[in-house]
Amino acid sequence: MSDVQVSDHPEVERYEISVDGRRAGLAAYELEGDVIAFTHTEIDDAYEGQGLGSQLARAALDDARARGLKVKPLCPFIRGWIKRHEDYQDLVVPTT
């Protein structure tokens, strides 16, 4: 079984997911006050189809919740993931 880890790298504004110590993908964001805007998510081609995008989204959103942040899902992947997981919809910043 592979060792999968998600970590926040605030100095470059992104969460990274790694498999056995190798970066497999990222979720880029911009942080403004108490709002985190996810702008781009990507998984390396070598790791596609393994559910890593979902693991990355869940971990990043769980971290946002723990930090008391609201989410602006600009990235289509994160936006779609939240739509499919009702228990995360409360994190989304209402649009005006």
Show where each model-derived region lies.
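Conserved acetyl-CoA-binding loop-helix of GNAT-fold acetyltransferases
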Residues: 49-60
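Conserved beta-strand in the GNAT
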Residues: 22-30, 37
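A short, internal acetyl-CoA/4′-phosphopantetheine-binding micro-motif in the GNAT/acyltransferase core
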Residues: 42-48
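Histidine-centered active-site/metal-ligand motif
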Residues: 9, 40, 85
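C-terminal structural segments of small proteins and small subunits
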Residues: 62-96
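Conserved N-terminal entry element of GNAT/NAT acetyltransferase domains
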Residues: 1-8
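Conserved beta-hairpin
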Residues: 13-24
